[in-house]
């Protein structure tokens, strides 16, 4: 019938979405109110609130729910009226409008993203066995430079988030401490994208809002050392399987077959052909941008 088979899934999904929409229309407003109240409390708590914000912000990264918290702190909380009478809300908007009190939810991210996480990457590099360091060095260098320049940290964080959750918990805790200390020191800094070196340099064009931003570099050096020491000790103490420290028996392919050299790619192609029964079993070979399509005589 029309409603059966492959058509049933989208039809049923649409129906259940309508039901869930009606339910959440009543359920979500109290939840939203609770989230907003929590955000208001974090703002009113001063340095402690900014520290809690930084800690929760990192903890929510794996789920993507950190964006809910970011929206409240960066675009809703607080109010600033400029000389023209325009009202600005949120830490980011108030900072770039010249509010000298803004930045408590941004300043402490600079030492972590520009210095702390690159320190963690260096620790993971030296924690890997010497023979595997060339394999992981390029990867760790690229994500560390990305974090330093742009403040995009997810590629680096996801390298150890699931392999070593303890390290990620420590990372979240250190992030909270950084925001707490930055607020206590009276540092007011901001970013338009993220807390990387590019935004740090552009921030100097806003002297009305930027205050004590040079202290972020001092904090950065300290947090680089803290991350390097803490990650190095914890990785070795608990034998965490960070990049390059995986058990050899868990490796599915050889280093040669996993490389981008001509020899490695030839070996990988040979393994694929053998896995589908050899060249005599192949009737047709086709490919698109995402898949390799093989038609075989004996499946």
Regions found by a protein language model. Give the residues of each.
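Non-transmembrane accessory domains of multi-pass membrane transporters/channels
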Residues: 235-298
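Transmembrane alpha-helical segments and their short flanking loops
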Residues: 83-102, 118-121, 126, 142-143, ...
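Short, amphipathic, aromatic/basic-enriched membrane-interface segments that mark the entry/exit
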Residues: 107-108, 129-134, 141-145, 190
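Hydrophobic alpha-helical transmembrane segments and immediately flanking/interface helices
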Residues: 37, 41-50, 180-183, 287-298
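Signature of multi-pass transmembrane helix bundles
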Residues: 1-74, 202-203, 210, 214-224, ...
């Amino acid at each position: 019938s029309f409603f059966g088979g492959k058509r049933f899934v989208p039809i049923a999904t649409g129906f259940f979405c309508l039901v869930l929409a009606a339910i959440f229309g009543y359920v979500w407003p109290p939840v939203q109110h609770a989230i907003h109240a929590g955000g208001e409390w974090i703002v009113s708590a001063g340095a402690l609130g900014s520290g809690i914000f930084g800690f929760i912000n990192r903890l929510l990264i794996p789920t993507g729910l950190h964006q809910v918290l970011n929206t409240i702190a960066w675009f809703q909380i607080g109010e600033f009226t400029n000389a023209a009478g325009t009202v600005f809300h949120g830490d980011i908007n108030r900072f770039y409008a010249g509010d000298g009190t803004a930045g408590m939810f941004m300043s402490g991210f600079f030492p972590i993203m520009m210095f702390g996480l690159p320190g963690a990457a260096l620790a993971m590099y030296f924690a890997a066995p010497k023979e595997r360091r060339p394999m992981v060095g390029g990867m760790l260098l690229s994500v560390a430079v990305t974090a330093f320049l742009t403040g995009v940290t997810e590629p680096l964080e996801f390298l150890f988030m699931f392999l070593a959750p303890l390290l990620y918990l420590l990372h979240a805790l250190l992030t909270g401490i950084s925001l707490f200390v930055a607020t206590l020191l009276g540092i007011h800094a901001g970013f338009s994208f993220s807390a990387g070196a590019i935004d740090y340099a552009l921030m100097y064009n806003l002297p009305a809002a930027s205050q004590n931003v040079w202290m972020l570099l001092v904090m950065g050096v300290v947090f680089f050392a803290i991350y390097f020491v803490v990650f190095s000790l914890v990785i070795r103490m608990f034998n965490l399987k960070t990049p390059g420290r995986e058990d050899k028996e868990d490796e599915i392919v050889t280093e040669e077959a996993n490389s981008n050299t001509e020899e490695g790619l030839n070996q990988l192609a040979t393994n694929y052909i053998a896995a589908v029964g050899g060249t005599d079993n192949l009737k047709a070979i086709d490919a698109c941008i995402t898949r390799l399509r093989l038609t075989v005589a004996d499946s």
